[in-house]
Regions:
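An acidic intrinsically disordered interaction segment
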Residues: 5-9
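Basic, nucleic-acid-binding surfaces and adjacent catalytic neighborhoods in DNA/RNA-processing proteins
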Residues: 10-180
Length: 180
């Protein structure tokens, strides 16, 4: 999207809708290509409650979410894996156990591959503690799909009025990744 048309269309469609942002991200008319993993992780990284109506978001929130989505999907396309966590947010103990078993996300044997259990902040982590605050991750349903979120990190109180909070994985997601 070199001319920014898709970004502008995304921002416009989200901001004029009463539908929840969690449902809008799964609507192919709003944005194509986002599956359940990217939806859950994108909303967590943006500290957005999945049940907030799109019209309650600012243009800045939508634009930053778009930028993060592009970075995550670019990384995923380059590496062939979906990884949304920063290295410092992964549990060392889980990496040791996972490596001893020898299984990796997508069956990859590369020792530098992030184990699936360490790849996500909230996706499929319901009943487990949030990697950032320790609150139990919850799950519910939006748009006939299960959605995962941290009730503390993704509450209205977790966002600031000017929304200047940096995404937890922004510097890492934009780092050069090895090609597959």
């Amino acid at each position: 999207d070199p001319d920014g048309t898709s970004r502008r269309r995304f921002v416009e469609r989200v901001r004029r809708s009463r539908t929840t942002i969690g449902a809008l991200l799964m609507d192919q008319k709003v944005v194509a290509g986002i599956g359940n993993i990217y939806r859950a992780e994108l909303l967590f990284r943006a500290r957005l409650d999945p049940f907030v109506p799109g019209r309650d978001l600012t243009a800045g929130m939508c634009e930053e979410m778009w930028e993060d989505l592009v970075a995550l999907m670019t990384y995923g396309a380059r590496t062939g894996r979906i990884v949304t966590t920063q290295p410092e947010h992964r549990a060392i103990e889980a990496r040791i156990v996972e490596r001893s078993r020898g299984t990796r996300q997508n069956g990859d044997e590369d020792p530098d591959v992030v184990p699936r259990e360490e790849s996500f902040y909230v996706y499929h982590r319901q009943t487990l503690p949030c990697r950032l605050c320790g609150t139990t991750v919850r799950s519910g349903e939006i748009a006939a799909r299960t959605v995962f979120w941290c009730p503390r990190c993704q509450s209205a109180r977790s966002r600031r009025a000017d929304w200047t909070r940096q995404h937890p994985a922004a510097p890492w997601a934009l780092a050069e990744a090895p090609a597959r």
